């Protein structure tokens, strides 16, 4: 449980126990809040990967800047978190709205994604539906 600060955001994140398969970045859906238990850090995935997950901007314990947010900002928030954790390349799993963020993340930062898993999502994007 920790917070990293970027130029416009304080990002709350959590990590599960390190595992032999290394880390996996989990991007959760709309309304995701790591205070809700059980969550992705308690899932069967955590038996195989060190799950890194965070509350996206405007949600949970991450700060809530005024104004509207763009997919580019959501994707760059993930990159900022990985920068702070000194992780260059990582498998990424995005669920629901997190899947849309994952797609923007791989579009903007392709060299940072070793594998991509999308679940229960759509192409979405700015102006797209998140449900």
Model regions: which residues?
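Active-site loop/oxyanion-hole signature of alpha/beta-hydrolase fold enzymes
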Residues: 52-93
């Amino acid at each position: 449980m920790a917070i990293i600060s970027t130029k416009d955001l304080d990002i709350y994140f959590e990590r599960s126990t390190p595992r032999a398969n290394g880390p996996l970045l989990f991007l959760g859906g709309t309304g995701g809040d790591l205070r809700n238990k059980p969550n992705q850090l308690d899932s069967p995935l955590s038996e195989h990967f060190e799950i890194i997950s965070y509350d996206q901007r405007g949600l949970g314990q991450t700060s809530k800047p005024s104004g509207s947010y763009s997919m580019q900002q959501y994707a760059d928030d993930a990159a900022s978190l990985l920068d702070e954790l000194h992780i260059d390349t990582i498998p990424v799993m995005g669920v629901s709205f997190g899947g849309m963020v994952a797609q923007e993340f791989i579009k903007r930062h392709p060299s940072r994604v070793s594998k991509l898993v999308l679940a229960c999502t759509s192409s979405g994007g700015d102006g797209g539906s998140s449900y």
